Structure formats: C-alpha cells, structure tokens
C-alpha cells in the first residue's frame, strides 16, 4: 500500500477535538482582532483632524484665502470641507480637549456597557449576541467616516456615534473569552491565552496600517473600510462560531483538568456535589494559604461561593454580587482599571504624540506607533509563560508593573533624542505595559470565571469577565480624557500621570503578591482538609 501524502499524515496526526479547538482558537482570534482594528482609526486620524501647521503653512493658507476673496487663482487651495489646520470643529486651539472628549465618549460608554454586557450575554446564545454586536459595530464605525463624505462638522454627531459604537462593542470581549474558556482547560492557560490575546496588538497594527493608508487623502475611508471588515467578520461569526464542545460532540477540557492548584489568585473550589465525594481530600497548600483570613485555619465566609444547581448541570447564572465574592476578582479588577488606563492612553494618543515630538505626518506616525503593539505581543506571551512556570499570576503582573513605571519615564526623555531611540522604547514600553493587561484580561479572568465551584459554568465566566474588563474600561475611559486635559501643559505631565497609574495598579496587587510569595509550593507544606458545613 502506498504511503500517505505528507499533508494527509499531518492532518490525521491530530484528533478531531484538536482540530476543532484550533479552529475556535483562530476564529475567536480573528473576531476580536477585527474589533480592535475598528478602534484604532480614531487615533490615526487625529493628526489629520487637526494638522500640525508650521508658520509657512499658516501664511500659505491666509494667502490662498485672500486669493479666493479677490477671485484670482490660488496656487494652494484647501478643499471646501477643511479649514485652516484641520477639520472643523477640531481645527481650533481646544482641539486636544475635543479629541479627548471623543475618546472619553467611546470608552465611558464601553465601561458602562461592559457591566450590562455580561448580564445580558449570559442569557443569550453567544453566536447571536456576538454577531449582532459585530454588525452594529461595523455600521457605526463606518458612520463616523461618512462624516467626511457628507461634510459633517457637528461635534455632537461624532460624539453620539462614538457612544453608540462603544456600547455595541461591549458584546465582543465577554463572548469570545467565554467561548474560548469553554474549549480550553486550565493547563498552560497563561501561554495559550497570552498567544491568543495578541489579537489585540494584531488588530491595532492592522487598524493603524489600514487607517494610515487613506488618512492623508481621504480619512473617511480610514473608518469605512475597518467598519466593513468588522461587519464581514460578524457574518463569519454567525456562520461558523461553535459555542461549546458539546455542540459538536467534542470532549470538554474544563471537566478533565481538575488540578487543585490553578494560579494563586485565591480561588476556593467548593460545590456541594464535589464536597460529598472529596470532603476528605486536603486542599492544595497555596489555595489553603490564600483562603485563610488569619493564617490559623479559619476560612472567611465571603470566600465561599456555592451556586444553586441541579446536580451539576452548571446552568445557573451567577449573580453580580456572587461573582464579586470570588477571591481575587476585586483586586484584579481594580488593578486592571489602572493598567488599562495606561494601555488605552497609548492606544488613542501615541500617534499624535509621535507627530508632535518627531514632527512626522499622520501616516508615518501611525505606522511607527505599531511598534508599541509589536512589543505588546511579546509582552503578553512572556507574561503568560512566566505565570505558568511560576504558577503566580499576581506576582508576574506586579513585576512587570514595577518595571513599567521607570520605563515610561525613560521613554518620555529618550523619545526626544531621535527616531532610533523612539523605536527601541516603543518596543520595550509596549511589552511592559501590555503584559499585565493581557494576563489579567485573559488567563486571570478565565481562571476566576471557571473556578471549580462553578463547575465550568460558562454563564459565570461571562459575568466575571465582564466585571473585570468593565472595571478596567473605567480606567480606559479616564486615561485618554486625562491625556487630553494634561497634554496642553506638556507631554511630560501625561507621562507622570501614566507612571502614577502603574504604581496604583501595583498597589492593588500587594496583598495577592504577599499571599503568593508567603505560601508554600504546590507540592510541599502542610495540608488542612476542608470539612463540609
């Protein structure tokens, strides 16, 4: 019998379950990358909405304006839909506040909507919910760009568009994390989700390149094209997304991976049915250490989360307060608030900062800003690998936050020395800023949302994810707004604000870091059995 072709041998070397998981991994990666792709254009177009005008440019503009009034031909004439140094109403001296308000409108709506999104999403099929969000997001992203073609100069139009877009985009994150959590267990979760979460940076890079291609010639297309891409991916989602392995008769890894230790984020694994069969088994020492309120054997009642169930079906939706009682949710949520403040300030203001400091045009500044996201890809993967190896999520985040603050100070100083220095600091800053943000929004959220007391309840995963990312989105809304208010007084003040935010993020993890470092390893130490009450 002839030997099978190499390609066929490769295909059959993997099981049916593995192929399905790879498909879901890639599909959810592309779906959320398209969300981020649609968020990036506003930061690229800022440099075009208010152009960097030199004294010669302003004199040229006045000369052409006088020629138009006298009826003579002008050697340089601006289009009718542009004014002196940009697009009204962003051509005035208060342009930074107006641009900051656009960011705040989107991000504030996103933060508020995220809390509601988890509650709504856990009661609707993920595929339908996500499809609706992507189609609506594509429509409102494109609507912003239509302001260029229809010569719209109403500030209210752009604000309302941003608000609605922010609300509908909240359908994305809880949905894709829940879907991925259904398909992948806890083994090597930091690495898997670190690689998967690079969709954030990939989406930002693609968004920068696509928006930058048209920003100087027809900035409306910088929004219309990404909007069309998101809508198209929404159709792909509707046609191909599989919410749970059981839907295609695949095994669920959430059931098979039952290792006592998960990651040191203080989770109590309790459920009545499990207690009946395992009540004589000892707790993992680190879990025990994280759950002891005074270190003497007493367990805080608020750390016990027991869901009503029907013998383990895992279909009951956890309440908002119930999710908050899961140890670690509040601390990581508040940490993410400040970590996301830093990340989104760079997302929305970095191209304009490069334009002002290095005096590059909007297209080149947008292309250069992608290096921050390239660094973010490596930072997210590195954080996942380290946290998997050390089995300490909070400590990994804390170390990167500790290094990020002085790096931002160096960035603010070195970036003024030339293009080469800017490139190096963009890569390093991107890695350190995005690492903790990536780890918390993916591996930590999935760990907390699938702790054993919930018995793999995807509804709970959606709620926990929404709480953590929703709290982080409050910081994402504040960061760009504060940057818009502080930047007129000097970019150095913006960087001081970012360094302070990193310090605050680290502060909220101190208790968890102390618990992780003071606990014995997972294979040693005294073990205390937990008795059913």
UniProtKB/Swiss-Prot annotation:
Family in the record: Belongs to the major facilitator superfamily. Organophosphate:Pi antiporter (OPA) (TC 2.A.1.4) family.
InterPro entries recorded: MFS, MFS_dom, MFS_trans_sf, SLC37A1_2, Sugar_P_transporter
Main localization category: endoplasmic reticulum
Gene3D superfamilies assigned to the protein according to its UniProt record, in alphabetical order: MFS general substrate transporter like domains
Bilayer topology annotation: Multi-pass membrane protein
Stated role: Inorganic phosphate and glucose-6-phosphate antiporter. May transport cytoplasmic glucose-6-phosphate into the lumen of the endoplasmic reticulum and translocate inorganic phosphate into the opposite direction. Independent of a lumenal glucose-6-phosphatase. May not play a role in homeostatic regulation of blood glucose levels.
Tissue expression as described in the entry: Expressed in numerous tissues, with highest expression in pancreas, kidney, bone marrow, spleen, liver, small intestine, as well as in fetal brain, liver and spleen.
GO CC annotation terms, alphabetical: endoplasmic reticulum membrane; membrane
Protein's name in the database: Glucose-6-phosphate exchanger SLC37A1
Keywords linked to the UniProt accession: Antiport, Endoplasmic reticulum, Glycoprotein, Membrane, Sugar transport, Transmembrane, Transmembrane helix, Transport
Activity control, per UniProt: Inhibited by vanadate but not by chlorogenic acid.
Recorded GO MF terms: glucose 6-phosphate:phosphate antiporter activity
Residue stretches spanning the membrane: 18-38, 100-120, 129-149, 157-177, 222-242, 304-324, 334-354, 366-386, 394-414, 423-443, 466-486, 490-510
Glycosylation sites: 81, 263
Biological source species: Homo sapiens (Human)
Catalytic reaction list: D-glucose 6-phosphate(in) + phosphate(out) = D-glucose 6-phosphate(out) + phosphate(in)
Localization terms from the record: Endoplasmic reticulum membrane
One Gene Ontology biological process: phosphate ion transmembrane transport
One matching Pfam family: MFS_1
